[in-house]
Amino acid sequence: MAEYDHYEDDGFLNSFNDSSQEEHQDFLQFRKVFLPCMYLVVFVCGLVGNSLVLVISIFYHKLQSLTDVFLVNLPLADLVFVCTLPFWAYAGIHEWIFGQVMCKTLLGVYTINFYTSMLILTCITVDRFIVVVKATKAYNQQAKRMTWGKVICLLIWVISLLVSLPQIIYGNVFNLDKLICGYHDEEISTVVLATQMTLGFFLPLLAMIVCYSVIIKTLLHAGGFQKHRSLKIIFLVMAVFLLTQTPFNLVKLIRSTHWEYYAMTSFHYTIIVTEAIAYLRACLNPVLYAFVSLKFRKNFWKLVKDIGCLPYLGVSHQWKSSEDNSKTFSASHNVEATSMFQL
């Protein structure tokens, strides 16, 4: 949902002179077009990508590792998350017409799945650290790790529900020039911001910095043809997280501590543009955490073949070659046991 909607039009316009009011009206028109369009793009891409990951994970890929457990829960959280975006897109163009119950429900669904996605990303990072740095121990305790992984995922969903209660309880529909779904309470907004910054940014960022630093050090001292590929993927994961999440979280932090920026129309543009960039994670997660796997890509081509699209795509030969290469690749136990991404 639009973070900007908690600070709606009337409050801004009252603090502006005539020139600033004209600029702000231009901004409101820009927001009315830009955010819904971005929401719909993220919705479509996230719906397709995360649905594919879920279908392949459930019907074509047995849960053989802790990473597999996480890669079922992550696209599920992202999928439910993006399914709330069409409602916010419509509300951005017009106003909130779905009532108070739907307001509370969608605020809860949106927030629960946001926290779940970020906490699972943190767990995936820690799991990769264990698989690479403690490879032998991780392999020998695979069954136990699978059990713990399911328990951890259940706990993540419960924790996400608990920390989302303020939005669910205090979420309401307000009439501020138009009907808005949100929470119009400064204390609640402060609590929500602190929780979002901690669980949704600083925790996964800290986990990535610590775990990936050790992983990189371990891989640099290791041999094998997987090293360079794994390092590239690590840097890609870190770069995508930093580029998509840092700007929006930085803007939210500035917004909460420097109220004078509220009189700057340029700052309002920054809020909604960085928000849209942050939501791209729901589209990119399937690529970063699933499609990098050779095993997953093999199962993807199986799905394409089963639904009858393979002959039309003209990739039957390539799919067969990819399948053979994947089988040859997976024959190496040592590589798979120590591979960070189980490629």
Curated annotation (Swiss-Prot):
Its main location: membrane. Disulfide bonds join C103-C181. Residues 1-33, 91-104, 166-188, 261-276 are extracellular. SUPFAM superfamilies: Family A G protein-coupled receptor-like (SSF81321). GO terms for biological process: calcium-mediated signaling; cell chemotaxis; immune response; inflammatory response; positive regulation of cytosolic calcium ion concentration. The keyword Glycoprotein applies. Residues 61-69, 127-144, 217-232, 295-343 are cytoplasmic. GO terms for molecular function: C-C chemokine binding; C-C chemokine receptor activity; C-X-C chemokine receptor activity; coreceptor activity. GO terms for cellular component: external side of plasma membrane. It is found in: Cell membrane. The chain crosses the membrane at residues 34-60, 70-90, 105-126, 145-165, 189-216, 233-260, 277-294. PROSITE patterns: G_PROTEIN_RECEP_F1_1 (PS00237), G_PROTEIN_RECEP_F1_2 (PS50262). It is a multi-pass membrane protein. The keyword NAD does not apply. Glycans are attached at N17. Receptor for the C-X-C chemokine CXCL16. Used as a coreceptor by SIVs and by strains of HIV-2 and m-tropic HIV-1. Belongs to the G-protein coupled receptor 1 family. PANTHER family: C-X-C CHEMOKINE RECEPTOR TYPE 6, CELL ADHESION MOLECULE. This is C-X-C chemokine receptor type 6. It comes from Macaca mulatta. The gene is CXCR6.
